[in-house]
Design a protein with these regions (language model features):
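Glycine-rich FAD pyrophosphate-binding loop
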Residues: 56-79
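Short beta-strand to alpha-helix junction loop
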Residues: 106-112, 140-149, 185-204, 213, ...
Length: 448
């Protein structure tokens, strides 16, 4: 008998703007009884949803249950900036791609495999262009160093035979309405999603074939007589096999302890403003998406729906030992967002932020996922390393394949990675990681 009490449960830090403007497409159902299943997936984010879809395809006659601690769309998966990126995106360094041409090709092949899976789901579940938009993204540079980083990234893409386009300052102004940027690097393969709508519509598409229980936190996970029992306050699920799609919370389930870095990213969304003459004159085209040339800079998106535009900005990171962020920290980050936005779009100074929030990333020192069969019949699809939209989608698919004994070249390549490296013990990890973050943010300068 294996017994495990879940140490901590997820916490929602602020209301995500993406969730606030999202609409729920199916009724919420809580776990309030004892349920038996062949498969249990814990976590209804990118990994869990993808694992459930893959399991349904591989084992259509078997019962699959998906549970989440909160309401789908309100958790971490509905709080990111909505970039499904096909090209390298390594947040552990200031340069997105630090590997050679072959490593770049392998990473892009994996990313595109995941994006193709997501595209099939989007089509099957009737997602609109506003929810799933293959529009590409631009790495924006506001400094000479940023321009050099873009040039280096462009060389990496060229060596791998990848399409890309450099934009000058005037072209960036035409795109964004801002004279802040010196140039940009456009890559066409990124898909832009409305993250809260994406996970909600994905879940809605699955809901007629699998049982989905929300607001049903798993407080303990016990193995007895060859089956796993997941207990929740008002019910339980027993299943032969379990897939954990809980990202950084995997260490709260007793696995990969001392190996994962829990990074908080902070974001704000403006109130809506008219998308007509005013909106276009001060913020360019109706929809665009910018990543910073330096990974520690500001990620910015403009979205427009029904004649109303909004800008979403994400910048600043902290490493935390707790799952909750204090009000003082949230208020300070909102002020940082205001300064960054005003520097780029001074004409929007009177447009306030409607929502500010934080979301957790999970990174490992060696950029390796927390993946594999961690106990008999218990599989981990965790640690997205800063690109959960794609990496967690991929991990969920691969976990389903591994758990069902399905062989594929993709799984063989994915399994060819080390375990996440150990991080220093606390408080040294907190001091060291936050120190590195601060230094990298200072170096990013106007990119932030």
């Amino acid at each position: 008998m294996t017994t495990g009490t879940v140490r901590r449960l997820p916490v929602e830090n602020g209301v995500s703007g993406w969730e606030a403007i999202s609409q729920r497409p199916f009724p919420l159902k809580k776990l309030e009884s004892v349920v038996s299943a062949d498969w249990l997936v814990i976590g209804a984010g990118f990994a869990g949803l993808s694992a459930a879809r893959r399991l349904q395809a591989l084992r259509p006659g078997e019962k699959i249950v998906l549970v989440d601690a909160g309401e789908i769309g309100k958790g971490t998966s509905g709080r990111n900036s909505g970039f499904m990126i096909d090209v390298p995106h390594n947040l552990s360094a200031s340069e997105y791609s630090s590997g050679g041409a072959e490593a770049t090709r392998v990473e892009m092949a994996q990313n595109r495999f995941a994006i193709a899976f997501a595209k099939d789901a989007a089509q099957d579940y009737g997602m609109s262009r506003e929810t799933f938009d293959p529009a590409g993204k631009t790495n924006a540079a506001a400094t000479g160093r940023g321009m050099k980083l873009n040039a280096n990234f462009g060389q990496s893409l060229k060596a791998a035979g990848e399409k890309h386009l450099f934009l000058d300052a005037q072209e960036m102004r035409e795109l964004t309405g801002s004279s802040y940027y010196l140039g940009g690097l456009y890559t066409p393969g990124t898909v832009l999603i409305q993250p809260a709508d994406y996970v909600r519509q994905f879940a809605a598409g699955l809901s007629d074939k699998i049982d989905i229980f929300e607001c049903s936190p798993v407080t303990s996970l016990t193995r007895k007589d060859g089956r796993w029992i997941a207990s929740s306050p008002s019910g339980s699920v027993n299943a032969t096999k379990v897939i954990l799609g809980v990202n950084g919370h995997i260490d709260d389930f007793g696995h990969f302890g001392g190996r994962l870095m829990h990074i908080f990213a902070y974001a704000s969304m403006t109130a809506g403003f008219p998308a007509g003459e005013f909106g276009s004159s001060v913020s360019g085209r109706d929809r665009w998406a910018l990543l910073p040339a330096d990974a520690m800079g500001a990620t910015i998106r403009k979205i427009t729906t029904n004649g109303v535009s909004r800008i979403v900005i994400r910048t600043k990171y902290t490493y935390e030992m707790k799952v909750a962020v204090g009000e003082h920290r949230m208020a300070r980050m909102k002020e940082e967002h205001r300064r960054s936005l005003d520097a780029r779009f001074p004409e929007l100074a009177q447009i306030g932020f409607e929502h500010s929030w934080a979301g957790r990333l999970c990174l490992s020192r060696n950029h390796a996922p927390a993946f594999g069969e961690v106990e008999e019949g218990l599989f981990s699809a965790c640690c997205e390393n800063g690109l959960g939209t794609v990496k967690s989608t991929l991990a969920g698919i691969m976990a389903a394949d591994l758990a069902t004994g399905t062989t594929s070249p993709e799984l063989s390549r994915y399994m060819d990675h080390p375990q996440p490296s150990r991080i220093p013990p606390e408080p040294f990890a907190w001091l060291g990681i936050n120190g590195v973050i601060r230094l990298q943010e200072l170096r990013a300068g106007r990119e932030g």
